[in-house]
Amino acid sequence: MAAVSGTFNMMHPNPRKRRDGLRRLGLLAGACGQLGTSVITLCTGTRDPEDMWRSHPENDVPEAWQDLLASMERALEIAEEYEVTLAFEPEVNNVVASAEKGRRLLDDMQSSRLKVVMDAANLFREGELPHAEEVLDEAFELLDEDVVMAHAKDVKNTGEVVAAGRGELDYDRYLENLRGFGFEGPLILHNLEEGEVEGSVAFLRTKLGVNATYSEQRGR
């Protein structure tokens, strides 16, 4: 098993909700050994009280960042206790909405237990895909050494998230960047229905065939 999801809203405006999420994270971390993994994936959350995947104007206020640091500090204490790694995703609707903020979080926390899940589709808001090369290159320049896992889904220029191969994400550039720093971790299909699996697998196999160097690295 590559990882388990410990996702909860680390930025929920209700402190009790944040504490409950941390409590559940502790239970999950304690079970990781039996589950056969040492990686727990997280999102950094949003001030939206109803939907942790919806942006909120208060995500960018200084108090929100301080709340995130407090939640992450406690989460990393749990990670240290159970000897697991926490891997967060930069995501446009969360407080860590960009690779730049992801780098800031890593630098603020200074923990070997904190790493990154790279999900290229999460880095683009509506209308931003024409700048994909610039955005992807910057993301890997800032985060490459801390990436332990990659997600494979897709996004349209409207901002709609879809299964891999059904959107407009520059997968050649995405895989080229993964290849460029010698990534050998898992690349996991994400955000798709059962009926979409076959098509997305075929799409990725084609792309990985084109990116032969990456395929060879994964085969070692």
PLM region spans:
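N-terminal glycine-rich cofactor-binding segment that shapes the pocket for flavin-like pterin cofactors
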Residues: M1-A3, H12-P13
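Short beta-strands and strand-loop turn motifs
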Residues: A3-G6, L42, E83-P90, M118-A120, ...
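Short, flexible segments with low predicted structural confidence
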Residues: A3-S5, E50-D51, R74-I78, M149-A150, ...
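Feature marks short, surface-exposed loop/turn motifs that line or immediately flank catalytic pockets
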Residues: T7-M10, T46-E50, N94, F124, ...
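Active-site acidic/histidine proton-transfer and metal-coordination neighborhood
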Residues: M11-M118, Y214
